[in-house]
């Protein structure tokens, strides 16, 4: 079954991601992976993770719940990533980030 990613939020201090996905039902999944699931991407589940862009990527899924707008807004409002800011310097100022590579292309600010 193919799943379409609607939205994704990353909590970089713990490496957990949350995504709204849709196939025949809209769900919220929270997971840990080196893979970033950008909006509009399409993936399928495998026994070892997900198939995204013709690559099998390991994913640990912690929970899946039916989509709830209030719950999703709570997740989005607690987001630690500065993805929606007008960051002219292209730098991340989140000193607690554990991600090796920023999925948004930001560079870690030096202390």
Curated annotation (Swiss-Prot):
Highest taxon, organism lineage: Bacteria
Location of the protein in the cell: Cytoplasm
Gene Ontology biological process terms, A to Z: cellular response to starvation
Lipid metabolism keyword on record: no
Alphabetic keyword roster: Cytoplasm, Stress response
The keyword Cytoplasm is annotated on this UniProt entry: yes
Gene3D superfamilies attached to this UniProt entry: 2.40.50.650
InterPro entries given in the database record: Anti-adapter_IraM, PmrD_sf
Cellular component GO terms held in the UniProt record: cytoplasm
Chief location: cytoplasm
NCBIfam families for this protein: PRK09919.1
Similarity remark: Belongs to the IraM/RssC family.
Function: Inhibits RpoS proteolysis by regulating RssB activity, thereby increasing the stability of the sigma stress factor RpoS during magnesium starvation.
Protein name: Anti-adapter protein IraM
């Amino acid at each position: 079954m193919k799943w379409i990613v609607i939205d994704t939020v990353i909590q970089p201090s713990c490496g957990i991601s949350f995504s709204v996905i849709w196939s025949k039902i809209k769900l919220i999944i929270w997971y840990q992976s080196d893979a970033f699931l950008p909006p509009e991407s399409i993936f399928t589940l495998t026994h070892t993770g997900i198939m995204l862009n013709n690559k099998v990527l390991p994913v640990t899924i912690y929970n899946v719940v039916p989509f709830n707008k209030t719950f999703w807004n709570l997740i989005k409002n607690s987001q630690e990533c500065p993805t929606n800011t007008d960051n002219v310097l292209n730098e991340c100022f989140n000193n607690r980030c554990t991600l090796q590579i920023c999925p948004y292309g930001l560079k870690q600010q030096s202390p």
